[in-house]
Regions:
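Glycine-rich adenosine-cofactor-binding loop
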Residues: 27, 118, 137-157
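Conserved S-adenosyl-L-methionine
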Residues: 158-163, 261-263
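Phosphate/diphosphate ligand-binding glycine-rich loop within oxidoreductases
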Residues: 15-131
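NAD(P)-binding Rossmann-fold cofactor-contacting core
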Residues: 161-187
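Rossmann-like adenosine-cofactor binding region
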Residues: 190-265
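Short helix-loop-beta connector
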Residues: 133-139, 238
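Active-site capping/gating segments
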Residues: 126, 247-248, 264-287
Length: 290
């Protein structure tokens, strides 16, 4: 239902009242997201007197932004760059996933008590399940230790994935990967290991032993369109499920090779949709009418 309304607007002027509760996106700069259209149409469909608006809030203003949540008695907010790793210290409570990720993308205001969570990993796991991919109790291999990759790794471990092999170049994010591995191994029953992406033989070995492979890097989208973190299709086998969290282009070089090898594949569009629907549930207590 919501998908049919993305980008069309939703006649908000017809439903704003004196009692309308506010939910916001706090980011800088604001880039045209689908979030306002998607959330507002879902609120209208289920009869919630909520309005979702975007606000430019930079890193120097996020503390004031959180105070505005309290002062204006907003129901909550989505938090995007550059504020995801900064906002947590101004909140009253963080969920385990947010604590482990060191990042927040959703805030819920319950009568002045602000709870921060991160729904990126939840969105990934729900999108995978929606596509018939269930890594619970199984092994996955993932490339990328940025924000999205970390959220996926943490949520997968919390949800019960048995083993995660993480690959990243030895850049600034490699240290973040080391921290994530330590947290997963000490706080969950999942076994996590970090490897250098330059070791392509090890990458193939881990992929050969995995149920799921995930690309959580930007390799495959502009300006790296047509490139892949996996060198060729010999790394894939039909039993391997492959997810590339990139959704523009819809079909990346990675997924093209995986499809040729007979793999079930998925792009990142579902992850984006389901992370938004997870936030909607936190604010309303009801599933989003997707």
């Amino acid at each position: 239902y919501v998908l049919s309304w993305l980008g069309k607007g939703n006649h908000m002027s017809e439903r704003i009242t004196f009692h309308t509760d506010l939910i916001g996106l706090m980011a800088y700069p604001i880039r045209p997201p689908s979030s306002p259209a998607m959330q507002n149409e879902a609120f209208a469909k289920l009869g919630y007197d909520y309005a979702y608006l975007a606000f430019e809030v930079d890193a120097n203003e996020i503390e004031a932004g959180v105070q505005a949540l309290r002062t204006l008695k907003m129901r909550g907010a989505n938090i995007s760059m550059p504020n995801k790793t900064l906002v947590g210290k101004y909140l009253d409570e963080l969920t385990p996933a947010a604590q482990m990720c060191g990042a927040v993308n959703t805030v819920v205001n319950d009568n002045g008590h602000l709870t921060g969570t991160i729904t990126d990993g939840v969105g990934f796991m729900r999108a995978a399940a929606d596509n018939g991919i269930s890594p619970i109790g199984k092994k996955m291999t993932i490339v990328g230790c940025g924000g999205a990759g970390t959220a996926i790794q943490i949520q997968a471990a919390l949800d019960g994935v048995s083993e995660i092999s993480i690959f990243n170049r030895k850049d600034d994010f490699y240290h973040r990967g080391e921290e994530t591995v330590q947290k997963i191994n000490s706080q969950t029953s999942c076994k996590a290991t970090l490897y250098d992406l330059a070791d392509l033989q090890k990458l193939k070995e881990e992929m050969d032993d995995s149920y799921l492979f995930v690309n959580a890097t930007g390799v495959g989208m502009k300006p790296l369109e047509g490139q892949s973190v996996v060198p060729d299709k010999s790394y894939f086998r039909p039993e391997l499920n492959v997810v590339d969290i990139i959704y523009a282009p819809r079909l990346t070089k990675l997924r093209e090779m995986a499809k040729e090898a007979g793999c079930k594949t998925m792009n990142g569009l579902g992850m984006m949709l389901f992370q938004g629907s997870a936030a909607f549930e936190l604010w309303t207590g009801e599933p989003m009418p997707i």
